[in-house]
Every structure is written in C-alpha cells, then in structure tokens.
C-alpha cells in the first residue's frame, strides 16, 4: 500500500522532528491506509509534551490536555497531537484517572484497544507494528492488545467497539476477545446511553446490520436494551 499524507500532516511531523521529538501518524489513519481506504482524519502521536507542542505551533486548542492531547490547527483543519503515554487506573470503567507521559512509542501502542488500531507510521521508517495489526488486517481479525479482559475492564465501551469494527470491516472477533466480552458484558452499564446509541447506529448503518445479533449472543444487549433483548430470547 502507498501512504500519501496530506501536506499539513507532513508539516506537523516535520516540525516536531526538526525540534528533536519523535512523531508518527497513529491509529485509525494507519489502519485505513493499509486497507486501501482514505482516512477521515489523521491523529499524531509524539514524544513532545503538550506544552512543547503548544510552543511549536501558532494555533492550538487544548482539546484534551489532561490526557496529553492538543489540537494543532493547520490550514483551517484541526489535527489531534497526543503525547506518548501510559494510562493509570480506570476507576469509572471508562476513563483513566491519570496518565503518565512517556518517550517510548511501544508503551503508547500497548495502551490502545485493538491491534488494528495500535500501529504507527512515519515516511522514513514505514509502518511500526508491535502487536501484529497488519497480520490481523490480512486475516480479518479483531483482537485486543494484551489481555482482553483487562482492556474491557479499563473501558467497557471497547466491547461494543469490537462488535462495531467487526460489522463495519466484516472482520471476525478473535476467540479470547469474544470470551472476554461475554465475561465482562455487565460492565457495559457504565457506558452512557448516548455513546451506546452512537455505536449501535454505526452497526446498523454498516454492511452487516445483522451483526446487531452479536450484541445478543455475547450478552451485551440485555444490559444495553433489555426491551430489544426480549425479541431474541436467552443469550447464548
């Protein structure tokens, strides 16, 4: 596949590198490009701390500075630039109470949800893939990074995202990841109705709207939409 990055993204990467920082395109943009799709947006991961990012660029917005994210506005478009980090405890089952900034790209990739979203890219180094994301794309598999049960206990929305990615991409959910969803299903109650509906709508609008049945099969539906669950009977 060929990576053709927008000029604005190249300029941001170049500026960070010129000042001695590591910087990569990260996450969904890498996944989409590998799959031959045009990314909707480009997120950048860097060793630069938020205050350093703000010094380097003329127009920035503190969109998530607590978690290391600054939006850099370049040619009237915003690009999220996030410092490499590790996450602290997830006491609410959705968000880390704290984050620790790190200088290591691998540690940053290790905190991400699925292998297909845990890759980075830089023109001079190519794709950085510590957890087999390219292989899982080739084999059409949704797989958690690390221990899936731990990933879902950190952020319960990830269970629903796994099924949404499965529906949108027509990928299979890896066995251990699927088992962990079934085991942790009750935790979906910690997720707001708005976020649940957002993910469910994406499933229904995908090429596999029938994947809504998977919400029943893994036990999520009974906690999300009990009135709809009754249409299916008992979870498998």
Walk through the language-model features, giving the residues of each.
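Catalytic cores of the polymerase beta-like nucleotidyltransferase superfamily
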Residues: 1-236
